[in-house]
Amino acid sequence: MAMTVHCDIVSAEGEIFSGLVEMVVAHGNLGDLGIAPGHAPLITNLKPGPITLTKQGGAQEVYYISGGFLEVQPNMVKVLADTVQRATDLDEAQAQEALKAAENALSLKGADFDYGAAAARLAEAAAQLRTVQQMRKGK
C-alpha cells in the first residue's frame, strides 16, 4: 500500500475535502508544487489554478482555487483557499467568455480603467480554463 498524508482543503464556505492522499499538486508563486508524504514543512501562497489530489489507489480529483495558502506539516497538508470548485463543476464555455471579456477590457483602457481588477479577472478565467483542461487530461 502506498504512503499517504492527510489533506484538508478549506474555503470560506467550509471544508471541501478531508482525507488521505498519495500526492497533492498545486500552483504556487514559483510554479507547480508536488507534495508527497515526507515532504519538508512549508507555507506558500497559491495562485489561481488547479489542485490535483491523487487519492489512495491512484484515483485523481481536480479542484479549482482562486488563490490561497498551502501549509505542509509532517503527516498533514492544508489548503486554505478563497474560493474552491470541483473541476467537474466548471463551465468551460463560461470560462472562455470570461477570458475574452477580460482580454477586451484590457485592450479598451479608458481614464477610469482599473488595470489590477482587469488583470485579476483575466488570471482567474485563464486558471479556470487550465483547470478544466487538466481535468480532461487526467480522464
From Swiss-Prot:
Main location, first listed in the record: membrane
InterPro entries named among the record's database cross-references: ATP_F1_dsu/esu_C_sf, ATP_synth_F1_dsu/esu, ATP_synth_F1_dsu/esu_N, ATP_synth_F1_esu_C, ATPsynth_dsu/esu_N
Subcellular localization, as worded in the UniProt entry = Cell inner membrane
Keyword terms, alphabetized: ATP synthesis, Cell inner membrane, Cell membrane, CF(1), Hydrogen ion transport, Ion transport, Membrane, Transport
Protein topology in the membrane: Peripheral membrane protein
Q: Name one GO cellular component term.
A: plasma membrane
Supply the SUPFAM superfamilies for this chain: Epsilon subunit of F1F0-ATP synthase C-terminal domain, Epsilon subunit of F1F0-ATP synthase N-terminal domain
Going by the entry's taxonomy, the superkingdom of the source organism is recorded as: Bacteria
Q: Name one Pfam family in it.
A: ATP-synt_DE
- The answer, when asked if ATP-binding is one of the entry's keywords, is no
Any one GO MF annotation of this record = proton-transporting ATP synthase activity, rotational mechanism
Oligomeric and partner information: F-type ATPases have 2 components, CF(1) - the catalytic core - and CF(0) - the membrane proton channel. CF(1) has five subunits: alpha(3), beta(3), gamma(1), delta(1), epsilon(1). CF(0) has three main subunits: a, b and c.
Q: Which HAMAP family match?
A: ATP_synth_epsil_bac
Q: Which family does it belong to?
A: Belongs to the ATPase epsilon chain family.
Q: What does this protein do?
A: Produces ATP from ADP in the presence of a proton gradient across the membrane.
This protein is called: ATP synthase epsilon chain
Please name the taxonomic classification of the source: Bacteria, Pseudomonadati, Pseudomonadota, Gammaproteobacteria, Pseudomonadales
Q: Which gene encodes it?
A: atpC
